[in-house]
Regions:
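Short conserved segment of the HATPase_c
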Residues: 193-205
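Short alpha-helical segment of the dimerization/phosphotransfer core of two-component systems
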Residues: 75-82
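Short alpha-helical Gxxx[C/S/T] motif in the catalytic ATP-binding
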Residues: 220, 224
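Glycine-rich ATP-lid/hinge loop adjacent to the conserved G-boxes
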Residues: 206-216
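Short helix-loop "hinge" at the ATP-lid/N-box region of the Bergerat-fold HATPase_c
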Residues: 162-163
Length: 261
């Protein structure tokens, strides 16, 4: 008689129980990931919305209906933007090993950047941060075939990372051409990150020791990495303690506007 057939039923049950327990633990871990990420994605727009609505109320009480209407418009844009972000987030979590599906459109990249920076101006100001957009490369053509939601989330998370963790007073966004590609760069004049900590800042739930304004969830740069990988791009960090950070996203040129996995 083989060892398999002679094994006690209790041993089989224990093995099945262990397998089921491992499965349940994976499901719980995935659920916790989803909850943490959802909290991360909801916290940012709620803060931005509260700023816009508070200003809308103040201006309306002062009789400035035009300015109040503009504040409400910005609040509506914030809601739309973060609804798209949550959709992207759910796809990343549902298929952790898969590449995010891009839906490319031909968009005016500087215009997208300017709109996002404008929507974050109040939050930056409330933190004492000045933002600047630089696009002085004469070879940089504004129109690019890319996924606008993914690109917006990449920049949004890089900016929010600078707002929350760097202790910066100035953040600069640069657009430029590269060989067969184009680059999006976010530079701050904050506290910087030690070389030994730089690789880990891109990992899920990692919060670098340099963070000076709250622990955060450690998800923003992980989301950036996943989306940049989907674009067949790369992200690099140049920093040292006391010198600030320069995050550079390099995205290959793409001529097609198809869905891409």
């Amino acid at each position: 008689m083989s060892n398999e057939s002679s094994r006690p039923p209790q041993q089989d049950r224990r093995r099945d129980d262990a397998t089921e327990l491992a499965r349940l633990r994976r499901e719980i871990a995935l659920r916790d990931d989803v909850l943490a990420m959802a909290a991360h994605e909801l916290r940012n727009p709620l803060h931005a919305l509260s700023l816009h609505l508070a200003l809308a109320r103040t201006t309306a009480q002062g009789g400035n209906a035009v300015d109040a209407a503009e504040r409400i418009r910005r609040a509506e844009l914030t809601l739309k933007r973060y609804a798209e972000r949550v959709t992207v987030l759910m796809e990343l979590v549902a298929s952790p090993g898969a590449t995010y599906a891009l839906v490319r459109q031909r968009i005016d990249v500087p215009a997208l950047v300017a709109t996002l920076v404008d929507s974050l101006e109040q939050e930056a100001s409330s933190r004492g941060i000045a933002m600047q957009v630089v696009c002085d490369d004469p070879t940089f053509g504004p129109w690019r075939a890319t996924d606008p939601v993914a690109l917006e989330q990449v920049l949004d998370n890089l900016l929010l990372n600078a707002f929350k963790h760097s202790g910066a007073s100035r953040v600069t966004i640069r657009l430029a051409s590269a060989a067969g590609a184009w680059t999006l760069q976010v530079e701050d004049n904050g506290s910087g990150i030690a070389l030994e900590d730089q690789r880990s800042v891109f990992e899920k739930f990692a919060v670098a020791a340099h963070s000076s304004r709250g622990a955060g969830t450690g998800l923003g740069l992980w989301i950036v990495t996943r989306l940049v990988q989907a674009m067949d791009g790369e992200i690099t960090l140049r920093s040292a303690p006391g010198t600030g950070c320069i995050f550079t996203v390099r995205i290959p040129e793409a001529d097609d506007m198809s869905t891409h996995r």
